[in-house]
Amino acid sequence: MSEIILTPKEQPEVPLEAPNIKPDVFAGKSIDEIKNIQIMHGNEVVKLGDFFEVSGEPADAPEDIKIIIDGDVYNTKRIGQEMTAGEIIVRGNVNMYVGAGMKGGKITVEGNAGSWAGQDMRGGEIEILGDADDYVGSSYRGDWRGMSGGTITVHGNADNEIGEYMNGGKIIIKGDVNIMPGIHMNNGLIIIEGNVVARAGGEMAGGTIVVKGMMQEFLAGFKYLGVEKDIELMVKNSPGAFYKFEGDHAIKGAKGIVYAAVGCNGHIAP
């Protein structure tokens, strides 16, 4: 796989909008042509080479390209938006909308990610080694269709409303989550290995949420179905005993499932 290395020259005060940083756009271009790719700096159209040193070996096909962003880009948005193939590695933090609308390939963020990581994601893989802000795998504002495919893994903590309006795919949070994971969820799988502050699965109609830590508060619209052991979800086993709930019955005909680890959640047991 050919590697193209982007080294940030500076951190702009006004954020960059860079949906063209993806293998699909870099494919078939020379290094000089890649430097001339357009991105947005506020309301100005600028060149990628104005803000990044560019080096490496180009390739003709997106699946043969690995883009390495060698440094922090905490003020650059939309990296990897709608990418279909290839790989992006960010050696630092990244701003909002990383991998939004992604259809294939892989993005690895070695630091933290801003809000809306994997928004409306349809395929591929996003791995965030640090923390993620709000709305991981969510919908666009005003839309009712969120992430529908692919996998997002966050090795740290995530903030509010992950998987909002989720329609498919899988989100794995290795740490803790704040409020309302899986709000308005319709399908897919969310696995939270840490704790949840409150309101998991609010107004969910379908899909599955697994909480291996403690849920500090739980909603009244869920029906207790009993205890299950060693549940198996989308190939991966989750060993141990779990309380099983169906809901949120604030929504007519809701069939969502929430599993909560027995060892951490005696306070919500009937």
Swiss-Prot record:
Keywords: Methanogenesis, Oxidoreductase, Repeat
Encoding gene per record: fwdC
EC number(s) reported in the record: 1.2.7.12
Designated name of the protein: Tungsten-containing formylmethanofuran dehydrogenase 2 subunit C
Listed SUPFAM superfamilies: Alpha subunit of glutamate synthase, C-terminal domain
Catalytic activity annotation: N-formylmethanofuran + 2 oxidized [2Fe-2S]-[ferredoxin] + H2O = methanofuran + 2 reduced [2Fe-2S]-[ferredoxin] + CO2 + H(+)
Presence of keyword Zinc: no
Segments annotated as Sequence repeats: 80-92, 99-111, 118-130, 144-156, 163-175, 182-194, 201-213
